[in-house]
Amino acid sequence: MLANIIRIATRQSPLALWQARYVQQCLNHLYPDLHVELVPMVTRGDIILDTPLAKVGGKGLFVKELELALLEGRADIAVHSMKDVPVEFPDGLGLTTICERDDPRDAFVSNRYDSLEQLPEGSCVGTSSLRRQCQLRARRPDLVIRDLRGNVGTRLAKLDNGEYDAIILAVAGLKRLGLEERIRCALSPEESLPAVGQGAIGIECRLNDDRIRQLLAPLNHPATAARVQAERAMNVRLEGGCQVPIGSYAELEGDTLWLRALVGAPDGSQMIVGERRGNVSDAEQIGIALAEELLAKGASAILQAVYHESSSS
């Protein structure tokens, strides 16, 4: 491996390529003599577009092919949306760098209505996220929630074709693609608790590759890393994947980390919520403790029902 080359494994969607190019630009700024190459590839999650994500099954739908490239030495790092990163990694790989978080909120997108409250009874809202579905149904049980797959451009086209009255996307993704004007309103965490790691970019690499880890070190954002660590620790304890009705969002107030979380039945009939505060140095323990609280309130029954539904479909 030449010392002045680094290869980035990335998905081929416009948003994934934006994220990979962002990391590429950061590295080029830090190391002007470094040659940074993109290695675009297709993942299973990109191919299976006619099935709701929760029913596709398995974890790491958007990362496994990238991880294989790392293990086989075809790439040096993989760039991910943190909300797509599974709770476990293959032996020898790990998440070493989390870049500064962008806006973590969900976006309400519609051509006719300015907010969720304005939607008439029976309006059709598109999202494949069980997390978004359960919160939408709990708040507006009179709406029709339908699955919506594809990249951001595909989803917007389906909205524009009249298939949906509104759709829910991530604010960060729309901003990164220069589509901020499509956002009618951003949903606060109180209205729609974000996904674990939403708005943050993570970088995975071989744990024994000291050269790469040293190059990546300046890209790590400690405050973001602590927040995401708490969110992911909670998700790990709940044994949650990417396609589960779990929301988790941490904020920093000085040295205090405030973590909020929910586990919801996809039909909106039940929502288990909790929150916990503690010193930022205890981020992982805060996440685990909050997960234990949710489990004690009955979260495991909701999650088991979701897993049973996805495995039997």
UniProtKB/Swiss-Prot annotation:
One of its GO terms (molecular function) is hydroxymethylbilane synthase activity. It catalyses: 4 porphobilinogen + H2O = hydroxymethylbilane + 4 NH4(+). It is an enzyme of class 2 (transferase). The modification S-(dipyrrolylmethanemethyl)cysteine is found at residue 242. Pathway: Porphyrin-containing compound metabolism; protoporphyrin-IX biosynthesis; coproporphyrinogen-III from 5-aminolevulinate: step 2/4. Gene3D superfamilies: Periplasmic binding protein-like II, Porphobilinogen deaminase, C-terminal domain. One of its GO terms (biological process) is protoporphyrinogen IX biosynthetic process. Binds 1 dipyrromethane group covalently. The keyword Transferase applies. Its EC number is 2.5.1.61. GO terms for cellular component: cytoplasm. Its cofactor is dipyrromethane. Keywords: Porphyrin biosynthesis, Transferase. Signal peptide: none annotated. Transmembrane segments: none annotated. It holds the Pfam family Porphobil_deamC. It comes from the Bacteria. Monomer. Belongs to the HMBS family. The porphobilinogen subunits are added to the dipyrromethane group. Tetrapolymerization of the monopyrrole PBG into the hydroxymethylbilane pre-uroporphyrinogen in several discrete steps. This is Porphobilinogen deaminase. It comes from Pectobacterium carotovorum subsp. carotovorum (strain PC1).
